């Protein structure tokens, strides 16, 4: 039994799916509270309309990189919103250069061998290295692990509108920590702001219509080596436990300083963690540059367009159905996913599946 139904739509960023047309705004609902016959009738009609659309939501996903906490790390934040700009789900992780005793992101060894990263350093996910990083936090007086803090901030943001979260930007960091009482990070305000930015990015992306209980959906994310050893992939999946409802792909590679690096790239170079002349860069953020290199190799689609094509293929499919692609050849998978032309399409699908199964 499927937990819900995903209906793929052609609506772009900012458009509204037809299935949501019966929904009314909170402002409209408030105006029906007047004690007149006409207002009471309108209130009844509003209730009926809401009942008709109950369990149906238009969902979009977006992702950003941010400098939410100082200059020694950067965050990657993902957010899913509905047609009312409410955060349905969010996900925070942060990446910092640590010693090689800790667990680095995929292809860390290759990054060191190429000279892009210092030999004694690895770029590491704070969630993956939760125990190590949280021990350092404990010495500084923290009472909660870093992963637990990230989860608490996510829980606070989920269910709130973009506008509601933006109101925190006018408060002091201390006031925000007090407001998000379940989290103890002094830079809580920065993480909430990053969720807002990810949600705004989602507004520009295409939507799917989900017919089911959105409260049952979970947003999960992993790092993977989906394409060779010169980069690493971040794959996100919104799932109801059976299907991939929405997905998001981006990939990060060390490029020259002529390109757009992740936040705090200058600090990473100054510390010696990253080689001079190099920046870690999002392929989506550097779509034009990276796609020009692909074009020289014979590609007919930009990298972002390819990622979007894979996402569109995956969205709405059962996890079990997607797992079957692991038994096919890379060429067969490329043929099946006609919306993408990447030779490693199979690897990207596998990364989304792995995220969904977390």
Predicted regions and their residues:
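Active-site- and interface-proximal helix/loop "cap" or "latch" segments in soluble metabolic
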Residues: 55-61, 65-219, 226-358
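Low-complexity, intrinsically disordered short peptide segments enriched in small/polar/basic residues
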Residues: 3-4, 50, 242, 276
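Bacterial lipoprotein signal-peptidase II cleavage site
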Residues: 11-21
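C-terminal motif of bacterial Sec signal peptides marking the signal peptidase cleavage site
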Residues: 6-10
């Amino acid at each position: 039994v499927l937990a819900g139904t995903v209906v793929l739509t052609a609506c772009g960023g900012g458009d509204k799916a037809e299935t949501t047309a019966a929904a009314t705004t909170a402002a409209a609902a408030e105006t029906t509270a007047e004690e007149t016959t006409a207002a009471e009738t309108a209130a009844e009609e509003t209730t009926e309309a809401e009942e008709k659309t109950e369990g149906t939501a238009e969902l979009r996903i977006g992702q950003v990189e941010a400098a939410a906490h100082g200059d020694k790390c950067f965050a990657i934040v993902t957010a899913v919103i509905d047609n009312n700009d409410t955060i349905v789900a969010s996900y925070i992780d942060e990446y910092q250069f640590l010693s090689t005793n800790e667990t680095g992101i995929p292809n860390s060894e290759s990054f060191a061998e190429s000279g892009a990263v210092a030999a004694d350093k690895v770029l590491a996910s704070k969630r993956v290295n939760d125990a190590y990083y949280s021990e350092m936090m404990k010495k500084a007086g923290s009472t909660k692990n870093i992963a637990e803090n990230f989860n608490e901030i996510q829980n606070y943001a989920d269910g709130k509108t973009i506008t509601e979260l933006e109101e925190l930007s006018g408060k002091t960091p201390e006031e925000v920590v007090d407001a998000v009482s379940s989290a103890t990070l002094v830079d809580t305000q920065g993480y909430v702001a990053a969720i807002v930015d990810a949600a705004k990015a989602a507004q520009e992306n295409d939507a799917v219509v989900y017919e089911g209980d959105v409260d049952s959906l979970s947003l999960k994310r992993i790092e993977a080596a989906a394409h060779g050893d010169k980069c690493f992939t971040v794959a996100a999946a919104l799932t109801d436990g059976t299907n991939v409802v929405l997905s998001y792909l981006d990939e990060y590679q060390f490029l020259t300083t002529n390109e757009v690096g992740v936040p705090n790239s200058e600090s990473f170079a100054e510390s010696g963690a990253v080689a001079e002349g190099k920046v870690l860069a999002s392929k989506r953020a550097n779509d034009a540059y990276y796609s020009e290199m692909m074009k020289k190799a014979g590609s007919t689609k930009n990298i972002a367009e390819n990622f979007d094509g894979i996402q569109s293929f995956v969205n709405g499919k059962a996890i079990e159905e997607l797992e079957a692609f692991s038994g096919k050849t890379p060429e067969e998978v490329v043929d099946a996913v006609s919306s993408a032309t990447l030779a490693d399409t199979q690897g990207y699908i596998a990364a989304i599946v792995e995220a969904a199964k977390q």
